[in-house]
Curated annotation (Swiss-Prot):
Keyword 4Fe-4S listed: no
Keywords, ordered alphabetically: Amino-acid biosynthesis, ATP-binding, Cytoplasm, Glycosyltransferase, Histidine biosynthesis, Nucleotide-binding, Transferase
Broad enzyme group: transferase
Task of the protein: Catalyzes the condensation of ATP and 5-phosphoribose 1-diphosphate to form N'-(5'-phosphoribosyl)-ATP (PR-ATP). Has a crucial role in the pathway because the rate of histidine biosynthesis seems to be controlled primarily by regulation of HisG enzymatic activity.
Gene3D superfamilies assigned to the protein according to its UniProt record, in alphabetical order: Periplasmic binding protein-like II
Quaternary structure and interacting proteins, as annotated: Heteromultimer composed of HisG and HisZ subunits.
BP GO terms, sorted: L-histidine biosynthetic process
Origin superkingdom: Bacteria
Listed NCBIfam families: hisG
Annotated organism of origin: Agrobacterium fabrum (strain C58 / ATCC 33970)
Name of the protein in question: ATP phosphoribosyltransferase
Family designation: Belongs to the ATP phosphoribosyltransferase family. Short subfamily.
Species lineage: Bacteria, Pseudomonadati, Pseudomonadota, Alphaproteobacteria, Hyphomicrobiales
Pathway involvement of the protein, from the record: Amino-acid biosynthesis; L-histidine biosynthesis; L-histidine from 5-phospho-alpha-D-ribose 1-diphosphate: step 1/9
Gene, per the UniProt record: hisG
InterPro entries: ATP_PRibTrfase_cat, ATP_PRibTrfase_CS, ATP_PRibTrfase_HisG, ATP_PRibTrfase_HisG_short
């Protein structure tokens, strides 16, 4: 049995189902509207599991589902080596949002990651502590700051609430957060660095890289149908 995981609610659920229907894989409910299982009309070899977007990313990485629709940001944050663990079969054209580095607007001389690196280097001497970054994306933040930009002098503050409010509340100096329009960042007097986009995310159709998928005609057919539909 092939399992496709879809978002369990909201616009993402509707849009994901629409993509599958265009691909000739019409989703039908099993039981009542609150059921977390579905099926594909005319296909006894496929089942649908309804999960949250973050759960889908995790289950794809673990290989407990075969395909899933979820945000690229969640996959790359949730998995240690995303490209080795999953295949991004298709970008679906909805759920657009960027994971970005944002700093206070009053930091007039900080417009790039290089500028921020200079600030981080001087921060401890000036303030007696490391630059604090509030985020829910600790893996992406570490990769972007340390590996891509060579910035080491910072500490991550786990954000449990509205990340964009952390600098004003004194909980952090800057943030790494996801944004669709940037309006919430502007409302909190934050600006995105010119080269501070970590991931340009959108909903993706993702396949778990499982040995048993190699040469499986049904797996290849599903992936091909989705690619053709978008």
């Amino acid at each position: 049995m092939i399992t496709i995981a879809l978002p369990s609610k909201g616009r993402m659920k509707e849009d994901a189902s629409a993509v599958l229907e265009r691909a000739g894989l019409k989703v039908a409910s099993v039981g009542n509207d609150r059921s977390y299982r579905g099926r594909i009309e005319g296909r006894d070899d496929i089942e649908v599991a309804y999960l949250s977007a973050s759960e889908i990313a995790r289950e794809i990485g673990a290989g407990t589902v075969d395909f899933g629709v979820t945000g690229e940001d969640l996959v790359r944050e949730g998995l240690t080596n995303a490209d080795a663990q999953v295949e991004f079969c298709a970008r679906l054209g909805f759920g657009h949002a960027d994971v970005v580095v944002a700093v206070p607007e009053i930091w007039l001389d900080v417009d790039s990651m290089a500028d921020l690196g200079d600030v981080a280097s001087e921060f401890r001497a000036r303030h007696g502590r490391r630059l604090a970054i509030a985020t829910k994306y600790w893996r992406l933040t570490q990769q972007f700051f340390s590996r891509q930009h060579g910035i080491q002098l910072y500490r991550i503050v786990e954000s449990l609430g509205a990340t964009e409010g952390a600098p004003a509340a004194g909980q952090a100096d800057i943030i790494v957060d996801i944004t669709s329009t940037g309006s919430t960042l502007k409302a909190n007097h934050l600006k995105i660095l010119s080269d501070g986009i970590i991931v340009r995310s959108e909903a993706c159709f993702v396949r778990a890289r499982k040995p048993e998928h190699e040469g499986d005609a049904a797996i290849q057919e599903i992936a091909s149908r989705i690619k053709a539909a978008v």
